Design a protein with these regions (language model features):
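Short glycine-rich or small-residue beta-strand-to-loop segments that form or flank ligand, phosphate
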Residues: 1, 35, 152-153
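Active-site-proximal flexible loops/turns
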Residues: 5, 9, 45, 84, ...
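Active-site segments that bind and position negatively charged phosphate/pyrophosphate groups
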Residues: 103, 107-212
Length: 212
């Protein structure tokens, strides 16, 4: 996958177990430069500082964040995503949504700028995700989802926040134990459950989410 490729770029200068990067036993100081031609809007790794490494032997799946993960350039052409099937597209939409959704609920000193960006992005993803469910070759919808993928996970919607990404961490545990579960599938299952458990911790924020 794209994030595994990024992990290999970090691992290029290290002779040990690549999983040492994800467990922070080894801290990368440099990586091979990479350019991206985006063919599936989902993980946001085309602009993010994140990568994820899985180990089926260890039954572990962990992320690793460093600016060394960021590509030097990205080419985004919505037509390149026309062939992505409905299920994979849907999983991508959920992942994009969750990247901002989780940042939205992270603690902050009432950072309205980040929240307004997040609300606009989530509305955009929901609207265009519905459009793609009816027509996978809707160019405008593909373009909106593609740019949302990039901006949902590049840090903008988390400005001024203590980023924890709890749902992603839970999903990593889920799909590490059962790799047949697609990342977006796991997130789609966990998001409603997380909301049901945590809404009482910040009811005002949940009301804002529902209204906006």
């Amino acid at each position: 996958t794209d994030t595994e490729t990024v992990a290999k770029l970090l691992d290029y200068y290290y002779d040990g177990d690549p999983f040492d990067i994800s467990t922070h036993k080894y801290v990368s100081q440099k990586s091979l430069p990479v350019g991206v031609i985006l063919t599936n809007a989902a993980s946001g790794s085309e602009l993010s500082n994140s990568c994820v490494i899985s180990s089926r032997e260890k039954k572990m799946k962990q992320g690793y964040n460093t600016d060394l993960n960021r590509p030097l350039f990205v080419i985004e052409d919505p037509k390149l995503t026309f062939s992505v099937d409905l299920h994979t597209t849907g999983c991508g939409v959920v992942d994009i949504f969750s990247h901002t959704f989780e940042r939205y609920f992270c603690q902050s000193d009432k950072m309205e700028f980040s929240d307004y960006l997040a609300e606009a992005l989530m509305r955009n993803v929901l609207d265009n995700g519905r459009r793609l469910s009816k027509n996978l070759k809707d160019y405008t919808a593909r373009a909106n989802i593609m740019i949302a993928s990039s901006f949902s996970h590049n840090g903008l919607t988390g400005i001024g926040k203590n980023i924890t990404m709890p749902i992603h961490k839970l999903e990593h545990e889920l799909s590490a134990l059962n790799p047949i579960i697609a990342h977006g599938e796991g997130l789609a299952i966990l998001i409603p459950s997380w909301m049901e458990i945590c809404y009482h911790l910040d009811p005002t924020k949940f009301i804002s989410f529902a209204e906006n």
